Amino acid sequence: QAARQVDTLFVIPVKEDRSEFSYTERKAMLEAGCRNIGNVIVCEGSDYSISAATFPTYFLKELDEAATTQMSLDLNLCAKRIASALGAKIRFVGNEPFDAMTQRYNELMHEILPLEGISVVEMARLSERDRAISASAVRTALAEGKFSEAAPKVYPTTIPYLLAKLATMAL
């Protein structure tokens, strides 16, 4: 949906290696999923975009005044350094029905980015049986060895990565 609204859509993966899938794996999944969308560029992640360097409380999931300050710093860096370098005037983001930290980040995005000339477009997540799909649900299904629950929640090009993860877990 986002790619239809702009000439070039830049996708910037979070560079931190703090999940079940490494940055390299996540970037490869994004590249595979976007391969046939001609105007999408999957960029290298940055140490200055939703990173432990600028936004450590995101990874601690502590929603407090420090977190809000760090979110503001992260969003200002995004606007003044990253978006300006790319010439990006719109930031697309998925809505967040589950995580209070990310909900607050989205709220601040709507406050801060327009001041820098960047529109924010918040899009509804894909859903399954009237429930928004989350990465947490996929991770939980994988941890429980329930591939049949995880697979419908991801893009088809991601399935080989899920199978590889399950195979590694089985060893």
What is the predicted function of each stretch?
Residues 1-171:
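Nucleotidyltransferase catalytic core that binds NTPs
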